[in-house]
């Protein structure tokens, strides 16, 4: 059986902390306002794999009202979500992530993001695609107020 899931996340800029996207620290003058580390790419991907396995969403599994997830490393959240997906008998077919940001530029960091994601979801790097786009200076991402991200995941029954 093949199952597909979709995820979406958005965070505003505004915290004095590192900007983490796709498990990689991206040099920028500000970080995200978020309960965890705010990694929009990994949050969207976590939602996509949970959705594909009918396991709910990131907020159900890791509620932002629970202090144990305060400043949590999103790579750990993704790994735990993937562990639960594996328990249901699924492996990754492929994942595709689109980061929507006017700034900072993602291109120099995409290969590192792909490698970390592949490690976390136990698949080959060729099964992980990460790309970035802008909104041509339109909307909140265009005004550089934050970043949005979409992800899709294809799961295959093992």
Curated annotation (Swiss-Prot):
The keyword Metal-binding is annotated on this UniProt entry: yes
Cofactor(s) listed in the protein's UniProt record: a divalent metal cation
Entry keywords, A to Z: Isoprene biosynthesis, Lyase, Metal-binding
List of residues binding 4-CDP-2-C-methyl-D-erythritol 2-phosphate: 9-11, 35-36, 57-59, 62-66, 133-136, 140, 143
CC cofactor note: Binds 1 divalent metal cation per subunit.
GO biological process entries: isopentenyl diphosphate biosynthetic process, methylerythritol 4-phosphate pathway; terpenoid biosynthetic process
Gene Ontology terms for molecular function: 2-C-methyl-D-erythritol 2,4-cyclodiphosphate synthase activity; metal ion binding
Catalytic activity: 4-CDP-2-C-methyl-D-erythritol 2-phosphate = 2-C-methyl-D-erythritol 2,4-cyclic diphosphate + CMP
PROSITE patterns with a match to the protein in the record: ISPF
Domain of life, per lineage: Bacteria
Binding site for a divalent metal cation: 9, 11, 43
Positions in coiled-coil regions: none
Record EC number: 4.6.1.12
Pfam families in alphabetical order: YgbB
Entry-linked CDD domains: MECDP_synthase (cd00554)
Residues marked Transition state stabilizer (site): 35, 134
Record pathway: Isoprenoid biosynthesis; isopentenyl diphosphate biosynthesis via DXP pathway; isopentenyl diphosphate from 1-deoxy-D-xylulose 5-phosphate: step 4/6
NCBIfam families for this protein: ispF
Task of the protein: Involved in the biosynthesis of isopentenyl diphosphate (IPP) and dimethylallyl diphosphate (DMAPP), two major building blocks of isoprenoid compounds. Catalyzes the conversion of 4-diphosphocytidyl-2-C-methyl-D-erythritol 2-phosphate (CDP-ME2P) to 2-C-methyl-D-erythritol 2,4-cyclodiphosphate (ME-CPP) with a corresponding release of cytidine 5-monophosphate (CMP).
Similarity comment: Belongs to the IspF family.
Subunit record text: Homotrimer.
The name this protein goes by in its record: 2-C-methyl-D-erythritol 2,4-cyclodiphosphate synthase
Gene transcribed to yield this protein: ispF
């Amino acid at each position: 059986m093949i199952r597909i899931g979709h995820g979406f996340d958005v965070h505003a800029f505004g915290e004095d902390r590192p900007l983490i996207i796709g498990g990689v620290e991206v040099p920028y003058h500000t970080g995200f306002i978020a309960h965890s580390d705010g990694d929009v790419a990994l949050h969207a991907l976590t939602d996509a794999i949970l959705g594909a396995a009918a396991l709910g969403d990131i907020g159900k599994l890791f509620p932002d009202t629970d202090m144990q997830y305060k400043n949590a490393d999103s790579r750990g959240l993704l790994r735990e979500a993937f562990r639960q997906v594996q328990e249901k008998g699924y492996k990754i077919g492929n994942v595709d992530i689109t980061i929507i940001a006017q700034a900072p530029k993602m291109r120099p960091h995409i290969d590192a993001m792909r490698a970390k994601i592949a490690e976390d979801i136990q698949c080959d790097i060729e099964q992980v695609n990460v790309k970035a786009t802008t909104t041509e200076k339109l909307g909140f991402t265009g005004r550089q107020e934050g970043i949005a991200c979409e992800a899709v995941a294809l799961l295959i029954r093992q």
